[in-house]
């Protein structure tokens, strides 16, 4: 584990063109330090942040692989990824973070196109058939689904094409044609046609079996997903007596895992296809204490609150944009005892935590989990609990004996420096600390604020150091 963390990452030959792995050339240990520091800067003021949970082997972890197809200047079929910020295709045969078998299948598909006279789709002319290929590989089951995204439902010799593909890769368990005839950048269309097999794969996670279709949302890193969801269930502290709501439930992953440890679980999701899969997943796992609804989660919670229904725990797993204030308002009105927030964006998480704090919810603990090695994303599980007015104790306080000076100072400049160096690895000056203090409305000595001459240029505290100093001030309860 330690040996792996300190070695330098192999540099990908298309790293600059692709742009998908922002941390190329950085050792895995450095990546983890960077991500943990980012989470700490944003969340330290809310509560306890645990060390980040990294991977033992941070390579080839993506069990969902997407390739876009195009033609080069000579008319040859190419497959790969879009160059960051463009729709120009960067040819890729293998990727250090993608499932190796999936990459092999994509190369085989590209090789079959010429013999079957299948043209790749051109976005400019809107001519051609094959637009994308999506591969999903069941980590625990080994099942493989191939999704061929075409611009037209007409797929000449499709049965022979599938036979030729399976001759090279007999491990493929199902092949689906997805029709996307829209002139948009969306990868998948709305219609699926099963060409071979059952049209979906299954995978196991935290003791539950899940049905995964072409359209299903399912986390792409199975090893870390197990850790992420186990941590979420552990944070909830379920004893078998709780009533639980799984908001943004998708295909029911968190809700079904929680069901074995709770009295009753309700899952709410707006996507109809996901709800259908969730219901099938409940039947597949013979889980009888869970019910799914195809509704807006916020409106659903408002109805529950109006009916005076009680909830012990709400799990929420919103998109990268975070939750909406409307949803958080509804959550506060329902007033569950605990909220477990699974976040894929620490910036929007911090924003939502500020809103929830105003509504009476305090973050207790946070666990960062590295779901995407070599990329700048980081997931975080956060436990919040309801802070009621009676969550107080009475004390006798003699104001005459209170030392106001010590209460105001809280921490010395050296203590702040030591904290910032220990927690963030940054060295800060007294000047920078005083600048941040002034921004936060804390009075400081004159010597730390004024230049020695009128024309002197005073250096301004960089944003990264300002955030770290603010975290220290919050730690010492000075802001």
Features from the language model and the residues they span:
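Short, aliphatic-rich beta-strand segments
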Residues: 70, 135, 142-151, 209-213
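Short cysteine clusters
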Residues: 12, 18-21
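Extended interfacial segments that mediate partner engagement and assembly in macromolecular machines
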Residues: 6, 22-120, 135, 140, ...
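Short, charged amphipathic recognition helices of the HTH superfamily
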Residues: 405-418, 429-430, 444
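Phospho-regulated, low-complexity intrinsically disordered regions of nuclear gene-regulatory
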Residues: 410, 458-479
């Amino acid at each position: 584990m330690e040996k792996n963390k300190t070695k330098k990452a192999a540099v990908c030959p298309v790293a600059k063109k692709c742009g998908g792995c922002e941390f190329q050339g950085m050792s895995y240990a450095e990546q983890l330090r960077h991500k943990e520091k980012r989470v700490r800067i944003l969340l330290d003021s809310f509560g306890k942040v645990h060390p980040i949970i990294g991977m033992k082997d941070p390579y080839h972890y993506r069990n969902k692989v997407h390739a876009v197809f195009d033609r080069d200047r000579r008319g040859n079929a190419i497959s790969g990824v879009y160059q960051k910020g463009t729709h120009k295709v960067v040819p890729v045969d293998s990727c250090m973070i993608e499932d190796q078998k999936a990459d092999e299948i994509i190369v085989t598909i590209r090789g079959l196109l010429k013999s079957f006279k299948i043209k790749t789709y051109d976005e400019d002319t809107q001519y051609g058939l094959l637009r994308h290929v999506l591969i999903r590989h069941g980590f625990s089951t080994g099942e493989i689904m191939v999704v061929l995204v075409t611009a037209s439902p007409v797929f000449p010799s499709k049965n022979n094409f599938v036979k030729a593909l399976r001759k090279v890769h007999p491990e493929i368990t199902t092949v689906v044609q997805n029709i996307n005839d829209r002139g948009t950048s969306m990868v998948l269309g709305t219609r699926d046609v099963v060409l071979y097999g059952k049209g979906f794969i299954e995978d196991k996670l935290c003791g539950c079996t899940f049905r995964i279709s072409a359209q299903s949302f399912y986390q792409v890193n199975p090893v870390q997903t197990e850790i992420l969801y186990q941590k979420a269930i552990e944070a909830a502290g379920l004893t078998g007596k709780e009533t639980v709501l799984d908001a943004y439930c998708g295909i029911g992953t968190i809700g079904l895992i929680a069901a074995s440890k709770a009295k009753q679980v309700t899952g709410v999701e707006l996507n109809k296809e996901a709800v259908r899969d969730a219901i099938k997943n409940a039947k597949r796992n013979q889980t009888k204490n869970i019910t799914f609804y195809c509704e807006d989660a916020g409106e659903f919670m408002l109805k529950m609150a109006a009916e005076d229904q009680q909830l012990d725990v709400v799990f929420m797993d919103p998109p990268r944009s975070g939750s909406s204030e409307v949803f958080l308002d509804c959550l506060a009105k329902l007033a569950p005892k605990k909220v477990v927030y699974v976040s894929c964006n620490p910036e929007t998480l911090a924003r939502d935590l500020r809103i929830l704090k105003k509504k009476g919810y305090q973050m207790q603990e946070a666990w960062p989990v590295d779901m995407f090695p070599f990329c700048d994303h980081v997931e975080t599980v956060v436990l919040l609990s309801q802070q009621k007015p009676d969550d107080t104790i009475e004390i006798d306080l003699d104001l005459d004996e209170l030392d106001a000076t010590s209460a105001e100072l809280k921490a010395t400049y050296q203590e702040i420096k030591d904290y910032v160096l220990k927690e963030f690895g940054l060295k800060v000056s007294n000047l920078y600390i005083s600048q941040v203090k002034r921004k936060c409305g804390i009075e400081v000595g004159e010597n730390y604020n004024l230049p020695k001459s009128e024309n002197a240029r005073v250096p301004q505290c960089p944003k990264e150091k300002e955030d770290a100093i603010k975290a220290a001030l919050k730690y010492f309860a000075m802001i």
